[in-house]
Amino acid sequence: MFKENIDCIDAGTEYCPCKLAESGECLLCSQLHGSTFCDCLNWKGICIYQEFYYNGNKAKEGRKTYNCIVEDRTLYDNEVLLIKFKAPHKLVIDLSKPGSFIFIRTEENIYFDVPISILDANIDTNIISIMIEIRGVKTKKLLEIKEGGNITIRGPYWNGVFGVKNIKKQKDSNAIVLARGIGMAPMLPVIKKLKENNNQVTVILDKAPFKDIYVTDYLEALEIVPQEMNLIDKGELSAEAK
């Protein structure tokens, strides 16, 4: 008998069970998916059904919204916005994982929630850094954010990086990280995790469509000297990258 490999990034966390359990659509718990027997997929060390029962047969509270103070704001070449803001310590810890992201908006705007990957989450200073490519109406609205002002965020959310399990398992080995454009932002937590696991990390960057590499300071802090390369040619991996 074969089972589909199904997982849930929230399983076993403080956000589990979620609204899917209330509607009988839990991804992992068989009893919260219409069955009358236990046949859990990807056991996470906690019984989701028991948590649901002890919580009054309802979902746990979802992600919270926070108003945070903007510590620094830098606009690079009118195309990339770097924002650093102060956040609660536990939230910073939660967002230090590879693939973490949040939803952000200006304090006055209740409609335009923008999902943004975490560039850096400093658990010593409680400063979170995010980098945003300015393109459409939602991201242009974020240009109104000023240093010393407030930013409204909702999170934490995880697994914005595919294959995050493999990143965590990679130890005492060699790794190559390729990134292009705004992909350089979520790249940083991945590099951090790889280096924490004693991997030798080679970083190859393609700054296109930007004019420059805007994460140089963060790479220097990790003692990484990136190689520059054209990674994409007419929608395909370039001959140079191959």
Where are these regions (language model features)?
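Amphipathic repeat-derived elements
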Residues: 1-4, 113-119, 165
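Detector for Asparagine
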Residues: 5, 42, 55-57, 67, ...
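Long, contiguous hydrophobic alpha-helical segments, chiefly transmembrane helices and signal peptides
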Residues: 16-18, 98-101, 114-116, 157-158, ...
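Cysteine-cluster motifs in flexible loop/terminal segments that predominantly coordinate metals
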Residues: 1-62
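FNR/FR-type flavoprotein reductase catalytic core
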Residues: 137-242
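Ferredoxin-reductase
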Residues: 56-152
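Generic preference for well-ordered secondary structure
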Residues: 13, 54-57, 69, 102, ...
